[in-house]
């Protein structure tokens, strides 16, 4: 955190990445009619850059204009710095000129959050200002610069039109509400193409061919809209209305949805069309994920609080510690209260130090779960915990579940990635009162749901649980019975417990809840500091159809660390006694056509880890083993629905690995391997262990689909680097190198 935030105070050149060579895009005749879902492989695609979009050719004799970029004035040079010249509006001005609008660029070093907010006289944020911000961010290579640009826009909104901050934030991460509410757009591309045709007079085949060429319906929509002449220009869009209309669209269906999409698209100008269409598709494609947005929001808040001391958009060094503290407080608050409708009004009204008090955790709003670090053996556990008091719990092979009850007695069930699974488990809700002991009005418990054999009274494999219906579950038709194993209590009767140690939380859990055979059980646990007892308990857990053990501290460093993969929880699985300490959860980003017996399906796949710092997917291996014929058929049918015409701009890979088809990052697989090694081809964790090489898996083998994880919850680059460095052969080499360095230094 310290490193990434303080980097904002370095020179601009330090915060940006070097440009990559342009991507070659195959030319396609715009008048050639393509099938509804064609898959065209891009030529010599470079994974590091976004495609350069050429001006569209037009049906008949109509001419089109290329997409307008944000206009930039010639640079002015003085003795100290070179900077963009940005038109500023005087503090007493009453109206923005056309030049003010066209030159709006929150990435400029001379940008002033108040003076350059050209909408300040109307107090309503134009959607075009947000769209231009997105456009600049999309064209920016450096992540820190992207965050700084967004922070400038947020600061302007805070100062000029604070009521627009909530919709601006949601639109920046392409959400319409907190994630746990499940309100999503996801309008089909075919529907949007028809709306674009209706609004612009374009031919549907032409729109399809251009979308195939660019891989981006948003770009096609913008170019179609820019080239269109209109007798009467609709009133300009503003952020508040666009957000409200998008929420309406999400709740509508049929022709009424189509009509509203059409009416909104007709009102779009310039880059508004691009990002409006992308929002409807559900892929904004600007590279801003939630953690980056929270950082931008924190920096924007500090700029706003010290606007009189800021020279343009630059924050004086004296406030850099405040930025670090504000970012940490904001991210911590969001972990326990993931709702911008609550957080943003609080940061605008109260001091940031009051944020956690103003945004408390409460039932019905999921927390980001605490996660465990993998270990390779019992000895490593005792090396980590030393003389601390520890407890070992069986690690159940099921689905993580955070179960909430509010004061009204309403039950909510959330997955590890905050997805609302309440409708999936009506049977658990029906029997939830039997769990209670004593006066319990509200609670949040952390648990694991497993498939349960009622007759044999034993746990069934995860694969059985995965066959259970996810939606529209009728309690009378449930075939897979479940049992809940509870291992933590986070909230009870209005009191948050996350700052208490595990011993206290467990005591309260046993006081207020009780087991019900085959329905509700406490995790089987053993408190011990004896290494032989831990080894024996591990073997017992495996016989009990579990994955292994979770080892936790009881008193020291034993608070519940929300949203953190903590070294105070260690997982010890039966597979850990091999060279690699853990399986990996990887994202499928590409597929290779099968040959021989596998003809007609994909025979192999390209997998990637997720780099949370750079918000990109980095290739880590090609995989073709561990699949049954049925697996390959299932994967091919599912992934075939998510093929894209080119690699995403946030995929990092070597061109030699290019698959036959690229996929959207929609599915996570659990994978085992023999070991990890440095690779000149794969890009996983590149720059962490080695400056020029990434890390790859040797002999990867498919284990299962992880439906409980989304792509951004996949194994991240830092975890991959840690797993590589934890291997015995790597540690031995490091020791040898260190010894040689010491000897060289001595002599």
Curated annotation (Swiss-Prot):
GO terms for molecular function: ATP binding; DNA binding; DNA ligase (ATP) activity. Its main location: nucleus. SUPFAM superfamilies: ATP-dependent DNA ligase DNA-binding domain (SSF117018), DNA ligase/mRNA capping enzyme, catalytic domain (SSF56091), Nucleic acid-binding proteins (SSF50249). Residues 725-740 have a biased composition (Polar residues). Keywords: ATP-binding, Cell cycle, Cell division, DNA damage, DNA recombination, DNA repair, DNA replication, Ligase, Nucleotide-binding, Nucleus, Phosphoprotein. The active site is at 395 (n6-amp-lysine intermediate). Residues 1-84, 725-747 are annotated as: Disordered. GO terms for cellular component: cytoplasm; nucleus. This is DNA ligase 1.
């Amino acid at each position: 955190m310290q490193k990434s935030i303080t980097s904002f105070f370095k020179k601009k050149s330090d915060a940006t990445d070097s440009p990559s060579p342009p991507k070659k895009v195959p030319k396609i005749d715009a008048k050639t009619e393509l099938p509804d879902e064609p898959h065209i492989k891009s030529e010599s695609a470079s994974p590091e850059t976004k495609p350069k979009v050429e001006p569209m050719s037009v049906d008949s004799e109509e001419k089109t204009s290329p997409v307008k970029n944000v206009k930039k004035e010639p640079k002015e040079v003085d003795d100290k710095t070179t900077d963009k010249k940005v038109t500023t509006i005087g503090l007493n001005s009453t109206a923005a000129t056309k030049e003010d609008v066209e030159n709006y660029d929150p990435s400029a070093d001379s940008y002033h959050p108040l003076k350059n907010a050209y909408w300040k006289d109307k107090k309503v944020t134009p959607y075009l200002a947000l769209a231009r911000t997105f456009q600049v961010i999309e064209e920016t290579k450096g992540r820190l610069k992207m965050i700084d640009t967004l922070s400038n826009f947020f600061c302007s909104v805070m100062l000029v039109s604070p009521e627009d901050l909530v919709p601006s934030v949601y639109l920046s991460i392409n959400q319409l509400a907190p994630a746990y509410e499940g309100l999503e757009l996801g309008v089909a591309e075919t529907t949007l193409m028809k709306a674009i045709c209706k609004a612009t007079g374009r031919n549907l085949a032409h729109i399809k061919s251009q979308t195939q060429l660019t891989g981006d319906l948003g770009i096609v929509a913008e170019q179609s809209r820019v080239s269109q002449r209109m007798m009467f220009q609709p009133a300009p869009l503003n952020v508040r209305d666009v957000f409200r209309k998008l929420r309406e669209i999400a709740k509508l269906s049929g022709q009424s949805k189509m009509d509203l999409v059409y009416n909104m698209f007709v009102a779009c100008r310039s880059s508004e069309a691009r990002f409006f269409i992308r929002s409807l598709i559900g892929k904004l494609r600007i590279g801003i994920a939630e953690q980056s947005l929270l950082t931008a929001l924190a920096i924007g808040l500090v700029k706003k609080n010290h606007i009189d001391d800021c020279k343009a958009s630059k924050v004086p060094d004296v406030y850099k510690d405040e930025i670090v503290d504000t970012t940490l407080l904001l991210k911590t608050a969001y972990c326990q209260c993931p709702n911008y409708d609550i957080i943003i009004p609080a940061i605008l009204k109260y001091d940031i130090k009051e944020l956690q008090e103003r945004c408390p955790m409460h039932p019905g709003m999921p927390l980001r779960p605490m996660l465990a670090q993998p270990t390779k053996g019992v000895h490593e556990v005792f090396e980590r915990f030393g003389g601390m008091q520890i407890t070992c719990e069986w690690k159940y092979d099921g689905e993580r579940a955070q179960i909430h009850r509010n004061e009204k007695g309403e039950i909510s069930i959330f997955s590890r990635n905050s997805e609302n699974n309440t409708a999936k488990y009506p049977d658990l809700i029906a029997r939830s009162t039997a769990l209670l002991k004593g006066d319990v009005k509200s609670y949040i418990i952390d648990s694991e749901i497993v498939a349960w054999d009622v007759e044999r009274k034993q746990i069934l494999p995860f694969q059985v649980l995965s066959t259970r219906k996810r939606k529209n579950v009728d309690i009378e038709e449930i075939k897979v019975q479940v049992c809940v194993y509870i291992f933590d209590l986070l909230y009870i009767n209005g009191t948050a417990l996350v700052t208490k140690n595990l011993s206290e939380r467990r005591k309260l859990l046993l006081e207020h809840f009780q087991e019900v055979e085959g329905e509700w059980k406490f995790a089987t646990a053993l408190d011990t500091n004896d290494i032989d007892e831990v080894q024996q308990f591990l073997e017992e857990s495996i016989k009990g159809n579990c994955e292994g053990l979770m080892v936790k501290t009881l008193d020291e460093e034993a608070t519940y660390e929300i949203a953190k993969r903590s070294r105070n929880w260690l997982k010890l699985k039966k597979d850990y006694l091999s060279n690699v300490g853990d399986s990996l959860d990887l994202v499928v980003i590409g597929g290779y056509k099968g040959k021989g017996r596998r003809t007609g399906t994909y025979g192999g796949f390209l997998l990637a880890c997720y780099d949370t710092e750079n918000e990109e997917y980095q290739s880590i291996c090609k995989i073709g083993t561990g699949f049954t014929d049925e697996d390959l058929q299932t994967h091919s049918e599912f992934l075939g629905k998510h093929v894209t015409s080119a690699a995403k701009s946030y995929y990092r890979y070597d061109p030699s690995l290019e698959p036959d088809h690229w996929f959207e990052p929609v599915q996570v697989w659990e994978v085992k391997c023999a070991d990890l090694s440095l690779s000149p081809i794969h890009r996983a964790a590149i720059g962490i262990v080695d400056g020029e090489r990434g890390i790859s898996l040797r002999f990867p083998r498919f284990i299962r689909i992880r439906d409980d994880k989304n792509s951004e919850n996949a194994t991240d680059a830092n975890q991959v680097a840690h797993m590589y460095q934890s291997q015995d052969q790597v540690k031995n080499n490091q020791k040898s190198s260190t010894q040689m360095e010491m000897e060289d230094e001595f002599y």
